């Protein structure tokens, strides 16, 4: 029934009655339906999320207001006025953690709005606490800054571009636009770790267009709008949307574990930080075991195996 069809009352009274009926409908529907109505009203013109992970990469706990919450595939898509959860992008996976007591399963960004996929509904308008998984965040920062160090060195020494980058669950792959020998990669690895030991700062800036035009920086594609520039020591200047450590020493170490020809260039697999350390521990334990079986010193096991093969 439309309020204009009611007879015997003024137009103002009709409108007031209609609003009362509408309010009564709204307060009696389920919380999830209310969320849906809120989203339908807010989707057009929702303000960009304030990105706390850009303001402070070490921020792991924050409070923010829930702007929307919509059911999606058995979970809930939540937006906030601000967030420290990094969304997947630029080769870097999304953060994980907890939001208002619900687990954060995924985070992505669309048109400047960061959307969190969580396991339980959150009430619109409520202030909630977010807790980012710090171990995962540090791991991703170590891998990403380590990649910048290696890519910067390769670009400076050989002129090759980084044309592909991905942080996987086990390792990191970087695709370079030209061939690299094992000896060249060994030199790159040594130089990369030297940069880490110098512990130079990692700086982040948003240059004005006039400054950007004068800046020599790496970028995989043409960019528009505000450009975020990450400078790693004196080895790399790159347009980047990812999270990074504050100083190179926090990367810990870099190990290039393998390389193969790929699309006319070279795909390098690498490990940084805790991943490099854990890989070293596993391989050292295996080397110790082989050393014991061969009754040979750990750095002489290859020669011992060769003697066995020659017998």
Model-derived features with residue positions:
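Intrinsically disordered, low-complexity N-terminal regions enriched in serine/proline/glycine
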Residues: 2, 10-11, 25, 52
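Intrinsic disorder/low-structure terminal segments
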Residues: 17, 24, 34-37, 84, ...
């Amino acid at each position: 029934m439309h309020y204009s069809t009611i007879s015997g009352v003024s137009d103002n009274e009709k409108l007031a009655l209609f609003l009362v009926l509408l309010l009564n409908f709204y307060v009696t529907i389920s919380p999830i339906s209310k969320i849906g109505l809120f989203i339908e009203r807010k989707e057009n013109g929702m303000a960009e999320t304030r990105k706390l992970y850009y303001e402070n990469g070490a921020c792991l706990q924050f409070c923010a207001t829930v702007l929307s919450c919509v059911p999606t595939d058995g979970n809930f898509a939540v937006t906030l006025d601000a967030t420290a959860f990094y969304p997947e992008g630029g080769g870097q996976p999304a953060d994980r953690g907890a939001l208002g007591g619900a687990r954060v399963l995924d985070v992505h960004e669309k048109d400047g709005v960061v959307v969190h996929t969580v396991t339980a509904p959150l009430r619109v308008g409520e202030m909630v606490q977010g807790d980012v998984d710090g171990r995962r965040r540090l791991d991703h920062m170590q891998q990403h800054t380590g990649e910048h160090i290696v890519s910067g060195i390769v670009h400076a020494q050989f002129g090759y571009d980084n044309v592909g980058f991905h942080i996987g669950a086990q390792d990191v792959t970087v695709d370079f636009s030209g061939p690299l020998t094992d000896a060249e990669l060994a030199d790159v690895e040594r130089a990369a770790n030297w940069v880490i030991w110098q512990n130079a700062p990692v700086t982040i800036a948003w240059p004005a267009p006039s400054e950007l035009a004068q800046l020599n920086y790496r970028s995989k594609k043409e960019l528009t709008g505000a450009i975020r520039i990450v400078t790693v020591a004196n080895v790399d200047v790159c347009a980047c949307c990812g999270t990074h450590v504050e100083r190179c020493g926090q990367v810990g170490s870099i190990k290039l574990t393998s390389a193969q020809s790929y699309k006319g260039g070279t795909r390098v697999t690498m490990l940084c930080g805790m991943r490099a350390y854990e890989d070293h521990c596993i391989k050292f334990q295996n080397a110790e075991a082989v050393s014991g079986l061969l009754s040979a010193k750990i750095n002489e096991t290859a020669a011992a195996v060769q003697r066995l093969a020659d017998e």
